[in-house]
């Protein structure tokens, strides 16, 4: 009893960690055998007590946490609010995903933390509780899924599914939850199988690399070492890692404290000695590692250190290589199995929050913060430095310090309540997480037209790319609408939101019904239409009997009508308007059908002075063959053509074009073929061939002549010069000139022959060699530049307003410079001369300040016949940013940003409705083909039509009869609407004006039978200055919604609607949903304001998408998008899951040296830098030796640290020496380079570094090489044993190469002997005589080389030391002997 009283009694819970410590102490005190007996007693005790207390596990023991209900309800409420914010466009998809995942993760984690206290209070002897929290079986995550909630799951690709599983396994899963659960569990099961096989294959490759590494000697005699220091410049090494690195190593140098030696060289380090060294505060300790051993085919006992099994120095003959490979590969398999039961459940981290301790007012320095968005899309302030936040209450002042890079979630002087979150601290950068960049694609939910916000300056990455980067946070809008899917429409050239008259154009139209909508004051009728295919024909279109209001937008270019030229539409040149016509000189046969006048209008519609308005490519100046242009430039007038590529980018200058005052130019034809570099050319340079000669496998020559082959970058130019070859003598004058044109009649005269040329010729001197030359006389095509078609007469005289005084000048210019080659691609022709029309105006009059001309197209549809009009007028200034544009009343137009660009003229049942335009001025027919009718139609600001003058008698009579019948019609003369800009509010009322004009469709520039009915416009016009013009105070018009693309705001009870909202609502403005625009008003749906009437607003439905800086927008402005099209790509970073399933591929990438991160890139850069610098400093022989050595040391340390970082982040502890043995093998080769090569090695050959050094010394000449990093697979296939290589992979290839090269396998490794059935050269009793012999051999060599060793004890030692992180290495050039 007395002995029992002296025993120490420990009253504490024994968990897994405590058991480990207990077993460790028992082994230290009693030894292995006695400890095993004690542990058997503990095991028996446990079974007996479990049986005595009758612990069993039943389904009733799974108790759900009571607080789960309201926690889940609170998370659902937050998710609903988040969904609303996303719908309103306040957060984008990535922020929504992040926040949703964190909401549910926080809920799940809170439930998990509640489990333990709940069990302790309600049922402390619950079997689940005791089993899980004692560590006997099951962990907290598994119990949490049983009694808490399963939470968020991963899909097979590893992405989070933002729909959580709210049930636990006790409650049972719904069908949806079960399917999602299968996703995650499938990921766990599949990952387990796949990663287990991956880890097994990794182990096989590792063992393959190092299977021949066996402990052969006690001491290799190296003087090198690696210095380990607990304190480094960059960071502090933890004491635990420092001790782990030192224990079991052997010292490379003596350690002195002052003058006293406390440890000797070649002494192994135990825990006692290491603790003493730490206590003494030793700065750096030099230790021996496998890196410092002097051979790559074996290792010595002292460089390896203690054996991890029994704690003494490793025995001779120990196969440490295989142990190292299995030590690295095995944890991958082991840790993969750990994730099996968890089944893909998401585990992540949330940010730390700072909460207010009590109610009060916030105070902080606003100069130290910067406004930003959190990763959840909330507004916040970012702190750059430590920020002091003061919370003032009535009697207490509390100060909180917010660390840098944190988010402050409150404003200055804001009142906060107790426990309110005021700041969010980001996760510390010291934690090791695998970050990966993920692309999140956002797809369009509906069909429509793309807009981005008006205040976003937008610049594309590439000029012609449809991917654009957003510079700041903004909204993208998809304006609702549909595409017309009928293939029977005659001219499908509607673009950029043209008004389409679907009932007229659609061949599937069934009927026209009439709707009636009752309002308080009046009853209106609306037209609607039924379609067979409603999904496809939902075009944004509306129509009303009383007239409607469309506003023109200048940013839209309308295509003209084509007959046979529909293929030109495929070029997507939306700013080009082609006027097809036949030859004026009645030469239809000679003209190509695609010829015509091209009018190119910049996207913003602005022409500068002296800019090209239209051009015409004359078919007479077209060539199909390549050649060279020659002409004499007498005088050049510069015509600068400017265009705005994108309206926000300002004016971009294009290439200067020159009008050449020449009457003729010359074209020297030649056949040119541009071939890839690898083409097999079947003709020789400077050879002469005939017609239809095979040049390559697929190309034959079109003409015969002299071959010229020119090799350029990655391509070959093959030219064929036709002509006569002349070998001149010394007296021949023609031989003195090269590259000249000789006019006809001139000839060459000499003693032998005389010849005169009928046409112009081109003389070219060819010099195949330095001594020989000959002259090639080539034919020349001569072109006379005559007066071409007078393009100005094709435009009507009243195209411009009379007071603007705009003129059109005609120029001809040559498209290619003098002596420049022209190249034709495939079968396309080359245009040599272009005729252009240049806009000019007089600057001497009162409008001298005018700088630009404004031009745009208008498309009018009448009875299915589409007509194009152009309008041109001067403007005083041009500002590229639209929202800031101010226009004077006399500028000729009013631009409205983002306005509905419809110009609806909608014919239905013989009635064509006219809608007023906001643009003042004149819109007129663009081109008249028939000279008898100068202008057919003019639409002016006063809404009056001027018909005529018609020279044809029949047309003239019809108009006169119409005027007689309707005497109240106002018809102005030609000077009226052209010269006046009437006020917007001055509208004319017309009685019906009937005009009959019988013209066929074939001529397509004249009007068919139609009838105009003008009605009084009953709408408000709001211009950009906020002025409201009441067009008709007595009407109350509501437009009919068509296909649910429009929303209407009725105002029946609020009389001051326009007064209150005139400063808020403007035409073209975008509204997010739930925005209140007036008092007592319903909240609007999201969309764009199209029409503001007296008591109603027409809004086009739109869906907003928020995009943040750096997001990539796909598509162009105002492009039509279909449902499912990619809209935006977000690129964001996320943390990978924290299990070994993600860490194992990382280890594999590092060991295979194909890492996707910066390891291999940095090492490659360092390798090149060291090779260059060291070679330059020390000269070539020293440079290659030291450069390669330092690079290898550097890369070895970097790789070891990287691999250890991965394993330590997973909680796996592997001794450094195992990794060092592997890394030593993959970094011990050098690549022989080509420069200064000796005859021993081939360029590109992989050899060992030691072999390269010894060969260099033996040959007494420099061998140029550089260090390379081999992956473990390549290292396995580059060993000294071809039997080992063949047993790994690619057996046939390896054996065939070995047979051809006559390789000899000395059977030094383990695997070769296993394959051949021999005794493996390993084991503690294997062949000691061989080891003894080699030791004597080494000693002799070392005695011979003592002079070389002394070299490194002097000044050179400082150069050879290289410091990197916590390691230091010195390199010796002593002789390295090998077995």
UniProtKB/Swiss-Prot annotation:
Localization annotation: Plastid, Chloroplast
EC number: 2.7.7.6
Iron keyword on record: no
One record GO biological process: DNA-templated transcription
Sequence similarity: Belongs to the RNA polymerase beta' chain family. RpoC2 subfamily.
Assembly and oligomerization: In plastids the minimal PEP RNA polymerase catalytic core is composed of four subunits: alpha, beta, beta', and beta''. When a (nuclear-encoded) sigma factor is associated with the core the holoenzyme is formed, which can initiate transcription.
Protein name (Swiss-Prot/TrEMBL): DNA-directed RNA polymerase subunit beta''
Organism of derivation: Capsella bursa-pastoris (Shepherd's purse)
Underlying gene: rpoC2
